[in-house]
Design a protein with these regions (language model features):
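N-terminal beta1-alpha1 ligand-phosphate binding loop
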Residues: 2-19
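C-terminal accessory helical subdomains adjacent to catalytic cores in phosphodiester-
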Residues: 2, 19-37, 51-161
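Conserved helicase/translocase motor-coupling segment
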Residues: 43-53
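N-terminal polybasic phosphate/anion-binding patch
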Residues: 35-45
Length: 161
């Protein structure tokens, strides 16, 4: 059975990213047996051509076990990482590594972020979808509390869920 490989941040077993992707696959009534997850660890691993998962994927493509790749990666914030942070930097770096690996004909990219700011991560995307009244409440709390965590969206979402 030819499979689709989904490459995402974190580990392959259980992260917010792959749990959400599994729910989406289920909701769309797609065959989950045809999907294999590759947890790439930290974001910078995506941009290392020697990363071990890439060798496994390349072998699986050559053996016709995998015929499609989906790269799911956080945009993060440009002010935190001038090289890979922000939507445009992430997209450029990811397209470069995909071309270097020879995966361009087999790949799609989804950069996870707040669609309005094009920055952030999975939690930013989820929080961007909540009603404005709730979003304002969260922003007011952050302002009043002077809560300055680098991962505000992650912290908030983990408390809400």
């Amino acid at each position: 059975m030819v499979k689709v490989a989904i490459l995402h941040e974190g580990n392959a077993k259980k992260t917010n990213d792959n749990e959400l992707l599994k729910l989406l696959i289920q909701e769309l009534e797609l065959d989950s047996e045809r999907v294999v997850f590759f947890g790439m660890g930290v974001k910078s691993n995506f941009f290392k051509p020697e990363y071990p998962s890439y060798k496994n994927i390349k072998n699986s493509i050559e053996n016709e076990e995998i015929n499609k790749l989906l790269f799911v990666i956080d945009a993060d914030y440009e002010h935190n990482d001038q090289k890979y942070g922000g939507y445009q930097n992430t997209e450029k770096a990811l397209k470069n590594i995909i071309a270097e690996l020879g995966f361009q004909n087999d790949s799609d990219i989804y950069i996870v972020c707040d669609p309005k700011t094009q920055e952030g991560y999975l939690e930013s995307l989820i929080l961007s979808s909540i009603p404005l009244q709730h979003k304002n409440c969260i922003q007011d709390f952050l302002y009043c509390s002077e809560f300055k965590s680098k991962d505000n969206h992650k912290s908030i979402l983990n408390q809400i869920l």
